[in-house]
Amino acid sequence: LQSYYEYSQDQRVIDLMTNYFKWQMTVPDDKLLEDYWENSRGGDNIISIYWLYNHTGDAFLLELAEKIHRNTADWTKSTSLPNWHNVNIAQCFREPATYYMQTGDSAMLKASYNVHHLIRRTFGQVPGGMFGADENARLGYIDPRQGVETCGLVEQMASDEIMLCMTGDPMWAEHCEEVAFNSYPAAVMPDFKALRYITCPNHTVSDSKNHHPGIDNRGPFLSMNPFSSRCCQHNHAQGWPYFSEHLVLATPDNGICLLYT
């Protein structure tokens, strides 16, 4: 919706998002973000709230952002994570840094950097910018035989792009390129008519066998398949469009910054 609005200026997007966020304000805390997935990924909600706030200036949106943060899984712990699911980590580690934009609390910004480095110190013996979590990261499974979901690849790219916008730190641009050019192309066919659920750096076969427990998830997840792994089928297409979108960014002095590979 946000991308569509920036293309079309369709007022219905603003109206719909405003009404949705007004509804969220009415949801009691004990009913908000209850589910495992939504509780992990509340940071995406905050990103959209800030986007709308920057277009409308509606004060209630900042109150809602505080409410969402309060009810989202805690990604600020120094030595552990709320869960070890690869897509959650790639998508959610930036939640504290996102909320930092409202609070100015530098500890929140540092927390996102910490999660990024923590997962790679522990499970990062995997080239291509990612970490070993073929569904979930597991102690003892840390070498290049381990893989990561296609969803995890594109969510990591998106998070790197968002972190770049929030911090101006070129590390995030470099890391996004590392994933985009060294991991993502191996996960999809050039014509995007098939993808694999799990991609490993030391990936010598593309068969339909179950490789559990070496691979955490049970199933035929090393094969290129146009029909399985619906989550990745719905998610993978954001990779290159968002990458291209973030090649041109605004600067604080009302200029533009062109990023080249």
Where are these regions (language model features)?
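Glycan-recognition and catalytic cores of secretory/periplasmic carbohydrate-active enzymes
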Residues: 1-259
